[in-house]
Amino acid sequence: MHYEILAGKATIARVETFLHDIDEIAGSSNATIQAIDATKVADRQHIDEAVHQALGSFTDGHNIATNLGVEILLHLSACRQIKKALNFGVHKGDIDVLFVVVGTTKSIERSLQRLNQLIDADPRVIDYSEAKRGQLMQTFNITDKEVKAAGGYHRIPELVRERLALFDAFK
């Protein structure tokens, strides 16, 4: 299985309609598509590690969820509780969004063409920024003391990825 990430900005009037459109694209393209709130993603490495872990869980038969998209959210959030992991999904309003598209090369290409119509592409929404700092610290229970010991706020993405590694090791 291959995957690609599409990132950008969207205005979501109705979450149900947005998710229905994504499900329709996934079904017609024969791909798995997971929409993610980009403000809860530390950086590209965070998303890559979560996707690799989720794919590995399915390969090894150690997956928690029966749906690959939900398994990606579980690993992304470093949390075993599906309800909490779903908080990494999209919400109503103006949002920075990521799509993880998993499938064959052809199914990914078809999906990306259609998903591009739903957003204004902007790959920078994946990158760590000071604007994400508070959200990430709260979401992953990272303390100021921990940040100081790690060497500063610019190390938050590393602390987030550490949470992912621990989640994968002890799930």
Residue positions per predicted region:
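Ordered, amphipathic secondary-structure segments that act as subunit-interaction surfaces
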Residues: D48-T104
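Low-complexity, flexible helical/coil segments
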Residues: V41-I47, L68-L73, K132-F140
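Helical mechanochemical/support elements of P-loop NTPase systems and associated helical scaffolds
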Residues: R14, F18, A78-Q81, S107, ...
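N-terminal interaction modules that seed assembly of large macromolecular complexes
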Residues: L6, T11-N67
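Glycine-rich, aromatic-bearing surface loops/beta-hairpins
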Residues: G89-K171
